[in-house]
From Swiss-Prot:
Residues 132-143 have a biased composition (Basic and acidic residues). It is found in: Cytoplasm; Nucleus. PANTHER family: PROTEIN KING TUBBY, TUBBY-RELATED. The keyword Transmembrane helix does not apply. SUPFAM superfamilies: Tubby C-terminal domain-like. Pfam families: Tub. This is Protein king tubby 1. The gene is king-tubby1. InterPro entries: Tubby-like_C, Tubby_C, Tubby_C_CS. It comes from the Eukaryota. GO terms for cellular component: cilium; cytoplasm; nucleus. Residues 44-109, 121-159 are annotated as: Disordered. One of its GO terms (biological process) is protein localization to cilium. Residues 47-72 have a biased composition (Polar residues).
Length: 410
């Protein structure tokens, strides 16, 4: 199994970061204590024998330019030993090979395959002429985006109020939350049911615990319990926030809050749907995913949508093209780089290893506004950054869906 997983990770379907230049190889001594800003690993991380996503090649080891660690760099964390029985990193989905490019920013994301009737991310800013990153629901790209639209002027967010309330509140506009997900395989069942921890990153390597999630063992489909209490991951716990549930093929994931389906007074709400494209032909490449979110009101509050009691939920609205109260996001299409023979995205130094899990979510109206990005930094550590209109719980659940096995996406 371990040899099979290593062979799967040697395929060119991994997504790497595009914000680094290749230079002459450096010795292992010179690389110690430096932070790498790379193609999410090429070629230093990809050639490392310890890298879980390494690409086997007959050429010599190539290295990458390094820079001194900045105040916002990831603090060094101890790597956890992965279990040989874990197969969460195997799956991939087809994607068209795009023309090679030295910079991802030089090629705009093609939106021809997106629905053009998705609700805007922020209806309150539709009529704002000050270079807002939001447009009308026509689906056309914004021609003149301000620096804030691309997130360059966003302030780093912090937890405000009780953690149980903060994790479900949409992020304020102009605020970027930088988080880290740690996968702990040391739990029960030989690592087959790891626990995932979400922390909000702070200055000087500090972090604040936000959420924890674990897959339920006795369930017909993948079912993750997400809680603010890492010591009690059950639906009866006081810290229970919601759950992530998949269909039998692992191609569609539903995110619900803590409400109960049969409770008519406080029905369970749909907070997100994650749809992964199927790959029945076995093509190799990064995953294609669609994320559906409830629309936002003019005062930046989430529209309440429930699929309980035979009501039309997020997925039903999307299928019937009733998109007035639905926000549709897609993963930003990576660019194929001939030099590194890999798919690349610009993660701005936040991702340091190639992985099929690495992705960025954007809206049809402005592909430059990264709503969420997620990627690997070591064997069991991943970064997760999100901004408006997502909340921490939605972003964490979307990230958890990328860990789950997908039969039809293999």
């Amino acid at each position: 199994m371990e040899a099979y997983i290593r062979q799967k990770r040697a395929t060119p379907g991994m997504v790497q970061a595009s914000d680094m230049q290749l230079v002459r190889p450096m010795s292992a001594v010179n690389r110690n204590g430096r932070e790498v800003h790379a193609y999410d690993g090429p070629m230093q991380f990809m050639m490392s024998p310890n890298n879980p996503d390494q690409i086997l090649t007959s050429t010599g080891n190539a290295s990458v330019t390094t820079t001194p660690t900045s105040p916002y760099s990831d603090a060094p964390l101890e790597k956890l030993t992965p279990s040989s029985q874990d197969s969460e990193d195997e799956e991939s989905t087809p994607v068209d090979i795009l023309p090679s490019s030295n910079s991802f920013d030089s090629t705009r994301h093609s939106a021809d395959h997106l629905l053009t009737h998705s609700a805007p991310i922020s209806p309150a800013l539709m009529n704002n002429n000050g270079g807002s990153h939001h447009d009308s629901s026509s689906g056309k790209s914004v021609e003149h985006s301000s620096p804030q639209a691309s997130g360059h002027n966003d302030t780093e967010g912090d937890v405000v109020g009780p953690i149980e309330q903060w994790v479900t509140q949409p992020a304020p506009q102009g605020v970027l939350y930088k988080c880290r997900i740690t996968r702990d395989r040391k739990g029960m069942d030989r690592g087959l049911f790891p626990i995932y921890y979400l922390h909000l990153e702070r200055d000087y390597g500090k972090k604040v615990f936000c959420l924890a999630g674990r897959k339920r063992k006795k369930s017909k489909t993948s079912n993750y319990i997400i809680s603010c209490d890492p010591t009690d991951l059950s639906r009866q716990a006081d810290g229970f926030v919601g759950k992530l549930r998949s269909n039998v093929f692992g191609t569609t994931f539903f995110v619900y809050d803590s409400g109960k389906k049969e409770d008519h007074g406080n029905p369970r709400l749909d907070l997100a749907v994650v749809i992964y494209d199927t790959n029945i032909l076995g093509f190799k490449g990064p995953r294609n995913m669609t994320v559906l979110l409830p629309g936002m009101t003019e005062d930046d509050q989430r529209v309440k949508i429930s699929s309980a009691d035979s009501q039309q939920g997020l997925l039903d609205s999307w299928k019937s093209k009733n998109m007035d109260n639905v926000v549709e996001l897609h993963n930003k299409t990576p660019i194929w780089n001939d030099e590194t023979q890999s798919y690349v995205l610009n993660f701005h130094g936040r991702v340091t290893q190639a992985s099929v899990k690495n992705f960025q979510l954007v809206h049809d109206s402005d592909p430059d506004y990264i709503v969420m990005q997620f990627g690997r930094t070591s064997d069991d550590i991943f970064t997760m950054d999100f901004r408006y209109p997502l909340c921490a719980f939605q972003a964490f659940a979307i990230a958890l869906s990328s860990f789950d096995g997908k039969l039809a996406c293999e």
